[in-house]
Amino acid sequence: MARILWVSDAGRATGFATVTHALGERLAAMGHDIHVLAVGWDAKYPVPGPLQLYRAEAGPARQYLGLDRTLELVEHLKPDIVLTVEDPPMVWRRFMDNRFDPDKKVLKRQPIISYLPIDGYGVPPQWLTLKRLVRVVPYSRFGAEQLDMDPDEAIPHGVEPIWRPFSKAERLTVRAKLGIEPDAFVIGRVDSNSRRKDFASTWKTINMALENGWLPEDKTVALFHTKLIETSIGVNLQTLISRGMGKFMVTNEVDWPVEQVVELVNCFDVTLNNSRGEGWGLNILESLACGVPVIAPDSSSIPEVVGDGGVLIEGRAEMTNPYGVDWILSDPLPMALALREMYNADATLRAKLADAAIKQAAKFNWDESAKRFDVVIKEELAKA
């Protein structure tokens, strides 16, 4: 089996870290020796499990992303494979434009596998060049198509068994703990507060539904697991909420234990996602696994994740991000109308929607994804 230097988030509550532990721990169980350059890990406490974590900021330059540790760890560990779970610009920077590795020693030494999220349309030529430098594995079929690759080369994310639908009694218990009425209509979202995630449009959608009387103000609760104020990369939700109607609950946290987040999601009647683009959409998939239907834009990788487990709404316009990639802006009006339809659904229809969400989530399995990565790793070792 292979010794692998894994480069990504680890030991923290981010999407990249979830992927690191879900895939990395399964590959370790198959016999691979996995060492992680753990971006964002503070090393305050050990992380249980088979992965050996190395703090990214422990290098001589204390560089947050561990750019100064990549070559150091390659020379120390002598891995058979380097495997990254990072955005394409970061992969390029780490291996092609890294002032701590000007001779590109890491790129030349061993095979590199890059598990890539593609969250928009019209990718830069630089990203296409990565295919000649590393083994690119897209998250999604959408991402593969944008990279001019066979969609079957994509390896999807999975969902852990802890993400499950609660019984009615369990749901009511959790709602009571949070001070939410048993018969409230709860619109939820678990996500980072960033420009791409566009929480402002989530607020606008809910507020529009309330202002037009499509949802009852006294029965509607918006429950967000995100930072309340994140003006450097996202939006000041506190300001938006003060401008509108309804009851909003914001955890102002991002690092809850996963068990607590599962409880939170099981309070939702519907997940409302207004993201401008997703490389995969892990929080969407986890909502579906809890039997919570999703309303989301019909763009990027989102349709292949949502499938029959929710309602997809066409976006209203394109916007170009700093990398020259086009995102799609969600349309609050039809999404607000979809919320109205979800609220008006009777018990039978809601049960059907929940069942469809669970069946859609069951299509994605971390065990199967890890097996496919094992094949990719062995293919790269055979070429080396």
Give a label for each model feature.
Residues 132-169:
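Donor nucleotide-sugar binding/catalytic pocket of nucleotide-sugar-dependent glycosyltransferases
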Residues 5, 181-197, 203-206, 222-224:
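Conserved donor-binding/catalytic core segment of Leloir-type glycosyltransferases
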Residues 39-42, 218-235, 250, 254:
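Glycosyltransferase donor-sugar binding loop
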Residues 164-180:
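A short helix/loop element that forms part of the nucleotide-sugar donor recognition site in Leloir-type
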Residues 341, 348-363:
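A short, well-ordered alpha-helix in the C-terminal region of glycosyltransferases
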Residues 276:
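Aromatic "clamp/platform" in nucleotide-sugar-dependent glycosyltransferases that forms part
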Residues 234-263:
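Nucleotide-activated donor-binding/catalytic signature segment of Leloir-type glycosyltransferases, i.e.
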